Regions:
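Transmembrane alpha-helix boundary and packing residues in multipass membrane permease domains
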Residues: 21, 25, 37, 74, ...
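Transmembrane helical elements of multi-pass membrane transporters/channels
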Residues: 16-35, 137, 148, 171, ...
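Short runs within selected transmembrane alpha-helices of multi-pass transporters and secretion channels
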Residues: 69, 138-157, 164-172, 197-213, ...
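Short alpha-helical transmembrane segments in multi-pass integral membrane proteins
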Residues: 1-18, 76-143, 174, 181, ...
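N-terminal transmembrane alpha-helices
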Residues: 5-43, 56-71, 75, 100-107, ...
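Helix-terminus/linker motif at the lipid-water interface of multi-pass membrane proteins
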Residues: 30-49, 118-125, 181-192, 255-288, ...
Length: 452
């Protein structure tokens, strides 16, 4: 598989890797969007506002696992490029076990402090009780979600983006079929109201993981849950040290982004539940553009790691340039569609005209800047492939904490709710400028070596 990867034209390798991952992100976003439509249309705007308040809280815990998976993905990519299958299993086993422990801790702590967290976020009083009820269920099913997210990241390290896509199809189909049935109590099921989407998501995740295990075993996949894989499920200090060296800064970055979203949400909540519902709707649309941009960056990082593992360092530059070009075509195209279809898209899950008009205006302010976000993410992804993460992460954190948040507060005071969204382009432009300078002036002059 490795030799075939390097024998193909780079653009073809990119697209074969990227296409299933982008489709996976679309499915994931679609699942969240359709669930929001179900809740908004069947339970009302207040219910949607209650669910929207959980987005940053769940993302806070997912950020830890995303960081862990990013570190493991680089190491697995290098080991896979060097054709060291035993090392691939060892890295995956140690990382997955740590991910399980994180999920259990997140479930306990998150459930205990759910009300305090949502109150601290300034969740509107008229939706607080519903938000807490939803949070309790969502956090208890979080371990299964985290394991699923982490395992799909590990699969990508060995260039398998098709299996995660097929598993997500299973998860999405089950979840979307169950959500309205649980909301209304169809087919003899108990009517669970606002908690329906969470329970349906749990059923979908468990179904997908069972199907994925069957598929990997049947295909003799290097990450199949067989005897050798379970033997590798141990907390190897050496491996985890290297995983955390790359993954921890990435996790910290994701947490800072999560915390920044909490601050943004707190600012939005000050404008009332209508603004909170608009925030949730805008987030859904933004996900359709931002996740594909991140997928391009992940692809660049994995392909770069495999090139390093195989000793093909001359491919690093072309991998970066191809990623930037695909970002222009794919992310840019989605941005254009977002502007053209924003009124119709937002109307899918916002029933009040005033709320939809507010959300449309906010979306138009920042949607274009996701192209800039994609550029900086791809540059950072290439550097991450070699294990260079600390400075790119610091750049991102400085731009979020030192630029975006102060700008959001100041612009909120000057322009009201729309000022909060004006801060996003400012931060993304800062990230792109600083990441590019570090790449050109420092990283390109460093010696690149395998990490494992």
């Amino acid at each position: 598989m490795q030799s075939a990867t390097f024998a193909k034209p780079l653009w073809q390798t990119y697209l074969l890797f990227l296409a299933p991952m982008v489709l996976s992100n679309f499915l994931q976003s679609m699942s969240g969007t359709v669930n929001s439509i179900y809740i908004g249309q069947m339970l009302g705007t207040q219910a949607l506002a209650a669910v929207s308040g959980m987005f940053p809280v769940v993302f806070f815990f997912i950020a830890l696992v995303i960081g862990l998976g990013a570190g493991a993905g680089v190491l697995i990519g290098q080991a896979w490029g060097a054709r060291e299958t035993h090392m691939v299993k060892a890295i995956a086993g140690a990382t997955l076990l740590l991910g399980v422990l994180i999920g259990l801790v997140a479930a306990v702590l998150g459930t205990v402090f759910a009300r305090q967290a949502l109150t601290g976020l300034g969740t509107p009083a008229d939706v607080l009780d519903d938000a807490v009820d939803y949070a309790h269920v969502m956090l208890w099913i979080l371990p299964s979600l985290l394991v699923f997210v982490l395992f799909t990241q590990l699969l990508r390290g060995v260039s398998d983006t098709l299996s995660p896509l097929l598993a997500l199809i299973v998860s999405t189909t089950v979840g979307l079929a169950l959500t309205p049935a649980l909301i209304r109590g169809w087919l003899g099921l108990p009517p669970l109201g606002i908690q329906s989407a969470a329970y349906a998501g749990l059923a979908g995740n468990l179904s997908a993981m069972a199907w994925l295990a069957w598929r990997l075993i049947r295909k003799g996949h290097p990450l199949a849950p067989d005897r050798e894989f379970f033997a590798a499920l141990r907390l190897d200090r050496v491996i985890l040290g290297k995983v955390l060296r790359i993954g921890l800064p990435t996790g910290v970055q994701m947490i800072v982004l999560s915390l920044s979203e909490l601050v943004i949400l707190a600012l939005v909540n000050q404008h009332g539940s209508q603004a909170t519902a608009a925030y949730g709707a805008v987030t859904q649309i933004v996900n359709y553009v931002q996740f594909p941009a991140l997928s391009i960056a992940i692809t660049a990082s994995i392909l770069g790691a495999q090139a390093i593992g195989a000793g093909h360092l001359q491919r690093m530059g072309p991998i970066l340039r191809t990623g930037l070009l695909i970002n222009v075509c794919l992310t840019g195209g989605l941005i254009v569609l977002g502007y053209l279809l924003s009124h119709w898209l937002l109307g899918l899950f916002l029933t009040e005209d005033s709320t939809r008009a507010m959300a449309e205006h906010l979306l138009h302010i920042m949607l274009w800047s996701l192209l800039v976000f994609g550029f900086q993410a791809i540059i950072g992804g290439i550097m991450r492939a070699s294990g260079t993460v600390l400075v790119p992460v610091v750049i991102s954190i400085v731009c979020v904490v030192g630029v975006q948040l102060p700008a959001a507060y100041w612009l909120d005071g000057q322009f009201g709710l729309q000022g909060v969204w004006m801060a996003f382009p400012v931060a993304y432009l800062g990230m792109l400028i600083l990441q590019t300078l570090y790449y050109k002036l420092v990283w390109k002059h460093q010696k690149i070596e395998r990490l494992i």
